[in-house]
């Protein structure tokens, strides 16, 4: 394992250690946060079976100490040796869960034998219904329209884009907020060039940016209402058309035209 990988693990855990107990409700860490920066399969497996074990244990300990839910992108390997790119969820006083597995895999992941997910369900924590997307999932609007149909309250995106311009990531995140009709929370590591990759960002259902880390490393904190909705203005001079944007779209959807 090269030193940058350990530095990244240490950076994340040190930021968690600096959070005061009771000061936040939800913490989100990027895709592959336990093996970020690996260069090949052997290196990934080395850290997954080594330092990653202590890192994941730290996530649970910090969730217990802070009293917050921690969501983190994790590479996992089951007892049969199957690799998956998943969202790990750590709740105070409860066993960790992995409610979502990355469904859309890039070719390098498939070549490593990583197995894609086969479902995209919501999971509920403290009365909030969450959906998830991991990196490449982000580029498939039908996933987000699916979450809109399920009435997600919040969609969490954990990512590790290395080449995408940050402006594109901002544009797409705002578009996904409209696709789902709910708040989008995106966590991703910054790259060496501020204009490439990164873009940890929170976007409200109306497409407005709540918080944005841009292309630089750091921690952003903010308040948001997980049950917020975009209320569209009246149209056609009908005052009763002032409705939840998402609810106004659902009855008009015609999936039979484009999902055959």
Task: Briefly describe each language-model feature range.
Residues 2-92, 163-178:
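Cys-nucleophile CN-hydrolase/nitrilase-fold catalytic domain and related Cys-dependent amidase chemistry
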Residues 34, 106, 228-230:
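Active-site/binding-pocket entry motifs
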Residues 50-71, 139-220:
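CN hydrolase (nitrilase-like) catalytic-core segments centered on the catalytic cysteine
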Residues 122, 190-260:
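C-terminal beta-strand edge segments of enzyme domains
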Residues 25-26, 130, 154:
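Structural motif
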Residues 33-34, 76, 104, 136, ...:
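Active-site-proximal loop/turn and secondary-structure-junction residues that shape catalytic pockets
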Residues 78-150, 164-171, 233-239:
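Active-site catalytic loop in hydrolytic enzyme cores
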